[in-house]
């Protein structure tokens, strides 16, 4: 038992702050290595333009693929053993893997370690499950929206810090620094997260069929998983072509990398500002209204992105899109809280994470395929169509049910 754990009532607000810090540290740790990932692949012996592109794409995607496979297993274990121990397992496991990545000698070792990183991940979905089971239901939207800003903040600062560290100390030391950040996350979680959890034996665990029957609305929960997948597909589809699209818009300028970095970052800044506020609004008017409105707003912003003429126009639209995106996943997570019990929260949030990871893999592939065949601008129009389908699909699923009465 950690020093923070005793018989006093759990202070969920303090747990939220500590979980936010943990999500921030893991978000930063994951994104620290992203700016130089292709350079590290090249340093490990991969040469040639096409081979470098292929291997960079594979080592990037394989983490999400294995995370999607492993998430349900870890979610089930969290429902049996508790969420805090899963947070500790994830932070420590990822820290050890990061050290090994810094010691990798060839691309195959690095590929296996990237897959292992995905297998051992799961800090964020378990943090979501922990907070969702402790926070009063009528504050779920605000709490989960606030928690989501932790990972976003870390992901925003990580690439900048990673690039500076790589330039100053070289590529391999950044992996060791990243491991140190994750070990720090482990100790913060160990000493400052409190959870009162009664372990459940394997025989007492609900099986998959029982999990489904225990849900208040199984079809709605499945539709929310699909919504999460499509949100990530839409977000990821733009990532592979953004820098090239900015270069096309900017023309012959010397600082295209800086401009691209700014435009890539502004949605995260907007989401950071909007997520807690829209989450709080969702607690008042209903997360389903926030979800549908944000999806429609996203469609209305994606379409003109296909017709912009300057990087500034694209940047403004991306900022507004980020404000809408900041409401989407917290709204989905709040609806999952409303429609499932604490007994299965670990598995529900882990299933949702699996769908999110699948979206992270398929989104960039879709964007790259569309841009290769139809040009950069077509990506935004197709993505708008995908999000519009998501809005109609979500509205159709949500209108068939009423949110249960919420109480403290």
From Swiss-Prot:
Superkingdom of the organism of origin: Bacteria
Annotated GO MF terms: transmembrane transporter activity
Membrane topology: Multi-pass membrane protein
Pfam families referenced in this protein's UniProt entry, alphabetically: MFS_1
Transmembrane segment boundaries: 16-36, 58-78, 92-112, 115-135, 146-166, 173-193, 224-244, 256-276, 290-310, 319-339, 378-398
Biological-process GO terms, alphabetical: response to antibiotic
Keywords noted in UniProt: Antibiotic resistance, Cell inner membrane, Cell membrane, Membrane, Transmembrane, Transmembrane helix, Transport
Protein localization: Cell inner membrane
Database matches in SUPFAM superfamilies: MFS general substrate transporter
Any one GO CC term of the record: plasma membrane
UniProt similarity note: Belongs to the major facilitator superfamily. DHA1 family. MdtG (TC 2.A.1.2.20) subfamily.
Function field: Confers resistance to fosfomycin and deoxycholate.
Name this protein carries in UniProt: Multidrug resistance protein MdtG
Species annotation: Escherichia coli O6:H1 (strain CFT073 / ATCC 700928 / UPEC)
């Amino acid at each position: 038992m950690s020093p923070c754990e005793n018989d006093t009532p759990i202070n969920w607000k303090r747990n939220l702050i500590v979980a936010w810090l943990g999500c921030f540290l893991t978000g930063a740790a994951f994104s620290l290595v992203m700016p130089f990932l292709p350079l590290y692949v090249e340093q490990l012996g991969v040469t040639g333009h096409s081979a470098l592109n292929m291997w960079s794409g594979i080592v990037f995607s394989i983490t999400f693929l294995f995370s999607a496979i492993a998430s349900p297993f870890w979610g089930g274990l969290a429902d049996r053993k508790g969420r805090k121990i899963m947070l500790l397992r994830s932070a420590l496991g990822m820290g050890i893997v990061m050290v090994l990545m810094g010691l990798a000698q060839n691309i195959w070792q690095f590929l296996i370690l990237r897959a292992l990183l995905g297998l051992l991940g799961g800090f964020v979905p378990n943090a979501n499950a922990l907070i969702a089971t402790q926070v009063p239901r009528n504050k779920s939207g605000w709490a989960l929206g606030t928690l989501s800003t932790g990972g976003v903040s870390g992901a925003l600062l990580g690439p900048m810090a990673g690039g500076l560290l790589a330039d100053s100390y070289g590529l391999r030391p950044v992996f060791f620094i990243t491991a140190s950040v994750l070990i720090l996350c482990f100790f913060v979680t160990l000493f400052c997260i409190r959870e009162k959890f009664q372990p459940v034996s394997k025989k007492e665990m609900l099986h998959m069929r029982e999990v489904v029957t225990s849900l208040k609305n199984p079809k709605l929960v499945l539709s929310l998983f699909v919504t999460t997948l499509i949100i990530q597909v839409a977000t990821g589809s733009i990532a592979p072509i953004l820098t090239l699209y900015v270069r096309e818009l900017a023309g012959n300028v010397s600082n295209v990398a800086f401009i691209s970095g700014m435009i890539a970052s502004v949605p995260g800044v907007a989401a950071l500002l909007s997520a807690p506020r829209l989450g709080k609004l969702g607690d008042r008017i209903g997360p389903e209204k926030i979800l549908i409105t944000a999806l429609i707003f996203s469609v209305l912003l994606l379409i003109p992105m296909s017709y912009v003429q300057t990087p500034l126009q694209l940047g403004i639209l991306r900022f507004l899109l980020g404000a809408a995106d900041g409401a989407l996943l917290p709204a989905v997570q709040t609806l999952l809280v409303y429609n499932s019990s604490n007994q299965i929260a670990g598995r529900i949030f882990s299933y949702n994470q699996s769908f999110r990871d699948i979206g992270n893999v398929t989104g960039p592939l879709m964007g790259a395929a569309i841009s290769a065949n139809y040009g950069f601008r077509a990506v935004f129009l197709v993505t708008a169509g995908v999000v519009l389908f998501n809005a109609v699909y979500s509205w159709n699923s949500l209108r068939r049910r009423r949110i249960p009465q919420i109480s403290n």
